[in-house]
Amino acid sequence: MFVLNEFTRRGFLGTAAAVGGTTVVTTALGGAPAAQAAVPEAADGGACGARTALVKVDRVDRRYQDLVTRGFNGRFRGRPDVVYVVHTADQVVDAVNQAMAAGQRIAVRSGGHCFEGFVDDPAVRAVIDMSQMRQVFYDSGKRAFAVEPGATLGETYRALYLDWGVTIPAGVCPQVGVGGHVLGGGYGPLSRRDGVVADHLYAVEVVVVDASGRARKVVATSAADDPNRELWWAHTGGGGGNFGIVTRYWFRTPGATGTDPSQLLPKAPTSTLRHIVTWDWSALTEEAFTRIIDNHGAWHQSNSAAGTPYASMHSVFYLNSRAAGQILLDIQIDGGLDGAEALLNDFVAAVNEGTGVEPAVQRSTEPWLRATLANKFDTGGFDRTKSKGAYLRKPWTAAQAATLYRHLSADSQVWGEVSLYSYGGKVNSVPETATATAQRDSIIKVWMSATWMDPAHDDANLAWIREIYREIFATTGGVPVPDDRTEGTFINYPDVDLVDERWNTSGVPWYTLYYKGNYPRLQKVKARWDPRDVFRHALSVRPPG
């Protein structure tokens, strides 16, 4: 069995991109992908005249296959009756009304990076494709930056930075769409410094369907006196496909004052200092591996408060299976920070202390935007995948570290990985009920994945990831229940196994794992704004009762 995993896609590709800057230790890739610049403030019709009319693509249209195969996960392929390509909020209203009149179940796609088959569900008959709604501009009326859901993170970063010098603390993959990323409370390299992206969400425009079955536009803001405020709150981590269709976000940092756009969102760094640290599996004994895991966890337990010198540091530890050849620690920090190089050196030394193994270290410095846009996410055609997640409040136990070693070091052709993301910092300074993103007391975010190409290998790969996940959380029913050690999991890492009692024996329902105590409040929003349960999928917020 030959399988390509996330390490190959992010690890090797990311490493190559990292060392192509102004300070070079090894050779590397070149520049950043092209992205759409900001456009002037515009009404719904667009900044440069009327936008394209609503496009309706059926199964015989030559564009159909391109539109229905945009999903990230090749395990799922939908066959809807129609795909609506929309360009304005009014067109979204029109498309929803047409689908409702035809009795078609609706799903929405922006970037297409959902890990499960929520859009490519066989029951979905109408897909509303948001990819052409991609404007980014400053809205002086709201003193906030408007971003449409079809814009990618890369396009958004480029526009915000080149025109105003600001950014949002969103994800590392520039191809990901803004639409679902923000809805799930997305995070990224600046989250320890600035919080999750939803912490900077001021307002949202949503197309909802009322009890009569008619669609309409609603704007909801964070203002305390806004009668629609709960709808805004639900979009700060409630996840996609629950309440309606987002047609526009507005971003402004809470407490930001004045009318100067350059002061209304976090300033982007001017440069990024990056270290890529690799350990060869051939040199790793179980003792060395578990010591690295222990050191990594202990460091985060001591360095995850807000406002420390490490606030702008982001690291991803790619614990790859032996088939990949290496494990890799990818670290970056604000290159303009005094002592940045020493901070990263100290972090690497702390993680490697007492292992007896000397890792390879590649160092680079490059302009922030170039570094940010260079993290291209490429599956290389290996697009069948399964993902799982967790939040850690404390480091792995000795038993969990041993479980990681046993599964990852096995002589297997399954190329899986367990990725450990630095977390905490500013994220943890926000009360868990202030937004729908409830996990506000964690030090590490975990993403587990297996990725492969051949459908014949589905069973082996699914078994691998399910078994490692269940064993790691064996003492809590096979899942990371909210307790003193773990804090549930991340809705943008959707995992339908959490609904299945074969894999979740904890007695804790899936919605508590994702939303903790915020779920009943989300249900109330659902009841008000989607009373007919038009927007639903396998892990959607259920109507109350």
Swiss-Prot record:
Inhibited by ascorbic acid and iron ion. Its EC number is 1.1.3.45, 1.3.3.14. Gene3D superfamilies: 3.30.465.10, 3.40.462.20. Transmembrane segments: none annotated. It comes from the Bacteria. Disruption phenotype: Cells lacking this gene accumulate various aclacinomycin analogs. Aclacinomycin Y binds at residues 451, 493. It is an enzyme of class 1 (oxidoreductase). The keyword Signal applies. It holds the Pfam family BBE. Predicted to be exported by the Tat system. The position of the signal peptide cleavage has been experimentally proven. Keywords: Antibiotic biosynthesis, FAD, Flavoprotein, Nucleotide-binding, Oxidoreductase, Signal. Optimum pH is 5.5. It catalyses: aclacinomycin N + O2 = aclacinomycin A + H2O2; aclacinomycin A + O2 = aclacinomycin Y + H2O2. Its cofactor is FAD. There is a cross-link at residues 113-173 (6-(S-cysteinyl)-8alpha-(pros-histidyl)-FAD (His-Cys)). GO terms for biological process: antibiotic biosynthetic process. Homotetramer; dimer of dimers. AknOx uses two distinct sets of catalytic residues in the two reactions. Tyr-421 is responsible for the proton abstraction from C3 of cinerulose A in the second reaction, for formation L-aculose. Involved in the modification of the terminal sugar residues in the last two steps in the biosynthesis of polyketide antibiotics of the aclacinomycin group. In the first reaction, it catalyzes the oxidation of the hydroxyl group at carbon C4 of the L-rhodinose terminal sugar moiety of aclacinomycin N (AclN) to a keto group, modifying the sugar to cinerulose A and generating aclacinomycin A (AclA). Belongs to the oxygen-dependent FAD-linked oxidoreductase family. This is Aclacinomycin-N/aclacinomycin-A oxidase. It comes from Streptomyces galilaeus.
